[in-house]
Swiss-Prot record:
Record-annotated membrane-spanning stretches: 34-54, 78-99, 114-134, 179-199, 227-247, 289-309, 321-341, 348-368
Name this polypeptide is given: Cytochrome b
Cofactor note: Binds 2 heme b groups non-covalently.
Residues engaged in binding heme b b566: 98, 197
Gene3D superfamilies xref list: Cytochrome Bc1 Complex, Chain C
Gene Ontology process terms (BP): mitochondrial electron transport, ubiquinol to cytochrome c
Membrane protein topology class: Multi-pass membrane protein
Pfam families membership: Cytochrom_B_C, Cytochrome_B
Requisite cofactors: heme b
Length: 380
């Protein structure tokens, strides 16, 4: 009998082992769809981004008008741009759900997979930030100025570092050029990191909603989960295309329709919605260095999660107190997101400060304590 090329060919064998014959737990729920959705998001963003880059000019005098030209004069340029801009939002929606799933079901106990995932999140955040600067509108310019300026809080080398990043003494043409180069490069880095992420995942196999070893009950990835993933793609593309076609500017800032002007500061400088929770934490501390450290900690805290797991059970499926705490954390993040979009005045300042303290308290203090408490409850 001739050998099956799918199982013998050096390249196809790898594809087969990760997408076709991959043994998968039979009980993984729709929360496990977001990984593949992130892959689709990445491919969509790279494709639309490549098409946009063909019509974009990375120069301060031409960037804004080149984006306008793409939308007005390029065949379906408006659609490509709208899909790319809103695709970024969906990318972040998916990654936040994906991280939430990992937190809830204890997937972080696969430490290598979790850590590469956090690095992926940081790279994605960097990519989205440099990408937001490219249209060279008011919010692009001032966002770049404010966020890069945060590095000046680093003692001793801060100011030098910022001027080195800018390529001058303010955000200008060199900054835009290098941000475009970075925005082109980073998605391919994300693609490479994704392969490492998957390599680590396939070492251990997928986790499942019960958090127990599922080797005795695994099914092939294809056709069961390929079909389930296609359903997921459809359910994601539907709202994405609806948003891109009917209300493409819903999530954007109107300020970005004004070309960048270093002489006029917008009344409210704020990032895109997916960074607002971190921005709120940054603003909550009335000290530059303290704020920057809290901002960094708000994301880097994810690296600590595996070490703070004190429960005997892996998932929260049978841990009601931890579940309650988890949903309080979700609500807290939504409050931070809302506060980040509001002006810096009473009562938003105190709400932001309380929500910031709550965020770190839940993750660093309450989760381990409740985990240990639930271990005690198992004895009764």
């Amino acid at each position: 009998m001739a050998p099956n090329i799918r199982k013998s060919h050096p390249l196809l064998k790898m594809v087969n082992n990760s997408l076709i014959d991959l043994p998968t737990p039979s009980n993984i729920s729709s929360w496990w769809n977001f990984g593949s959705l992130l892959g689709i998001c990445l491919m969509t963003q790279i494709l639309t981004g490549l098409l946009l880059a063909m019509h974009y000019t990375a120069d301060t005098t031409l960037a804004f008008s080149s984006v306008a030209h793409t939308c007005r004069n390029v065949q379906y340029g408006w659609l490509i741009r709208n899909l790319h801009a809103n695709g970024a939002s969906f990318f972040f929606i998916c990654i936040y759900f994906h991280i939430g799933r990992g937190l809830y079901y204890g997937s972080y106990l696969y430490k290598e997979t979790w850590n590469t995932g956090v690095i992926l999140l940081l790279t994605l955040m960097a990519t989205a930030f440099v990408g937001y600067v490219l249209p060279w509108g008011q919010m692009s310019f001032w966002g770049a100025t404010v966020i890069t300026n945060l590095f000046s809080a680093i003692p001793y080398i801060g100011q030098t570092l910022v001027e080195w990043a800018w390529g001058g003494f303010s955000v200008d043409n060199p900054t835009l050029t290098r941000f475009f180069a970075l925005h082109f490069l980073l998605p391919f880095m994300i693609a490479g990191l994704t392969l490492i992420h998957l390599t680590f995942l396939h070492e251990s196999g997928s986790n499942n909603p019960l958090g127990i070893v599922s080797n005795c009950d695994k099914i092939p990835f294809h056709p069961y989960f390929t079909l389930k993933d296609i359903l997921g793609f459809t359910l994601m593309f539907l709202p994405l295309t609806t948003l891109a076609l009917f209300s493409p500017n819903l999530l954007g800032d109107p300020e970005n329709f004004t070309p960048a002007n270093p002489l006029v500061t917008p009344p409210h400088i704020k990032p895109e919605w997916y960074f607002l929770f971190a921005y709120a934490i940054l603003r909550s501390i009335p000290n530059k260095l303290g704020g920057v450290l809290a901002l960094a900690a708000s994301v880097l805290i994810l690296f600590l999660i595996p070490f703070l797991h004190k429960a005997k059970q892996r998932t929260m499926t049978f841990r009601p107190i931890s579940q309650l705490l988890f949903w309080i954390l979700v609500a807290n993040l939504l409050i931070l997101t809302w506060v980040g979009s509001q002006p810096v005045e009473h009562p938003f300042i105190i709400i932001g400060q309380l929500a910031s303290v709550t965020y770190f308290t839940i993750l660093l203090v309450l989760f381990p304590i409740i985990g240990a408490l639930e271990n005690k409850m198992l004895n009764y």
